[in-house]
Structure formats: C-alpha cells, structure tokens
Swiss-Prot record:
Note: Two isoforms, fructokinase I and II, have been found in this organism.
The UniProt record lists the keyword Glycosyltransferase: no
Stated family: Belongs to the ROK (NagC/XylR) family.
Reaction(s) catalysed (UniProt annotation): D-fructose + ATP = D-fructose 6-phosphate + ADP + H(+)
EC number: 2.7.1.4
Name of the protein in its database record: Fructokinase-1
pH profile of the protein: Optimum pH is 7.0-8.0.
Origin species: Lactococcus lactis subsp. lactis (Streptococcus lactis)
Amino acid sequence: SVYYGSIEAGGTKFVLAIADEHFNI
C-alpha cells in the first residue's frame, strides 16, 4: 500500500511518499 501525505512545519511544506518498504521524504 502507498500513502501520500503532507506535513507543514516551520512554514515549510514536506511531502511524504511512504510504501511498504520504501521511505521517501
């Protein structure tokens, strides 16, 4: 399964792409 999300921290937006055995920030 793949999850796409976004986190806003310090006024900067980070995009997360997470797969079962893959972690990409």
